[in-house]
């Protein structure tokens, strides 16, 4: 029975899924990744997660940003209450770390290989051990996302 529910969730296309999450977005969810970039972002998160080059959750992400780790922070745009993650964009700007919002904490959690919805993740190329040999799998899409972030910030 549980499998049927999961199948229903993914039966639509990603565009329909993206649009269905838009009404739940918080007003501070800017810069929000457009559909195409959102899809690329989720694939990159999934690949980075397989290599263990990802930090999940507010506590881990804040700790890494404060320590000066370089990477990409991805925040869920439908977190309630928004105070949970409202300090992270300011922290990222102070430390020159690019950040983006995605439409859903469920999609972000699924992409980062957890069964739970995830409020924020940080892709850290090389991971905690700085093992750059496994970065090649997602490096190209990671760099494309990083290039598109400044254009989205308004």
Curated annotation (Swiss-Prot):
GO CC terms, sorted: box H/ACA snoRNP complex; nucleolus; nucleus; sno(s)RNA-containing ribonucleoprotein complex
Phosphoprotein among keywords: yes
GO molecular function annotation: box H/ACA snoRNA binding; rRNA binding
InterPro entries recorded: eL8/uL1-like, H/ACA_rnp_Nhp2-like, Ribosomal_eL30-like_sf, Ribosomal_eL8/eL30/eS12/Gad45, Ribosomal_eL8/Nhp2
Residues bearing PTM Phosphoserine: 119
SUPFAM superfamilies in UniProt: L30e-like
Broad class of the protein's primary localization: nucleus
UniProt cross-references to Pfam families, sorted A to Z: Ribosomal_L7Ae
Compartment(s) where it occurs, according to its Swiss-Prot or TrEMBL record: Nucleus, Nucleolus
Any one biological process term the GO annotation gives: rRNA pseudouridine synthesis
Highest taxon of the lineage: Eukaryota
Keywords for the protein's UniProt record, in alphabetical order: Nucleus, Phosphoprotein, Ribonucleoprotein, Ribosome biogenesis, RNA-binding, rRNA processing
Subunit text: Component of the small nucleolar ribonucleoprotein particles containing H/ACA-type snoRNAs (H/ACA snoRNPs).
Summary of the function given for this chain in its UniProt record: Non-catalytic component of the H/ACA small nucleolar ribonucleoprotein (H/ACA snoRNP), which catalyzes pseudouridylation of rRNA and is required for ribosome biogenesis. This involves the isomerization of uridine such that the ribose is subsequently attached to C5, instead of the normal N1. Pseudouridine ('psi') residues may serve to stabilize the conformation of rRNAs. The H/ACA snoRNP complex also mediates pseudouridylation of other types of RNAs. The H/ACA snoRNP complex mediates pseudouridylation at position 93 in U2 snRNA. Directly binds H/ACA snoRNAs.
Family listed: Belongs to the eukaryotic ribosomal protein eL8 family.
Protein name: H/ACA ribonucleoprotein complex subunit nhp2
Organism this protein belongs to: Schizosaccharomyces pombe (strain 972 / ATCC 24843)
Organism phylogeny: Eukaryota, Fungi, Dikarya, Ascomycota, Taphrinomycotina
């Amino acid at each position: 029975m549980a499998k049927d529910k999961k199948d229903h969730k993914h039966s639509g296309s990603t565009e329909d899924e993206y649009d269905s999450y838009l009404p739940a977005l918080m007003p501070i969810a800017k810069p929000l990744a457009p559909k195409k970039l959102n899809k690329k972002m989720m694939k990159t998160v999934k690949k980075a997660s397989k290599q263990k080059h990802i930090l999940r959750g507010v506590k881990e992400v804040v700790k890494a940003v404060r320590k000066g780790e370089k990477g990409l922070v991805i925040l869920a745009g439908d977190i309630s209450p928004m105070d949970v993650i409202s300090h992270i964009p300011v922290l990222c700007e102070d430390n020159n770390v690019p950040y983006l919002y995605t439409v859903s904490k469920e999609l972000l959690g699924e992409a980062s290989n957890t069964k739970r919805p995830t409020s924020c993740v940080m892709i850290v190329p090389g991971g905690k051990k700085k093992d750059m040999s496994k970065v090649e799998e997602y490096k190209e899409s990671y760099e494309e996302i990083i290039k598109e972030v400044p254009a989205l910030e308004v």
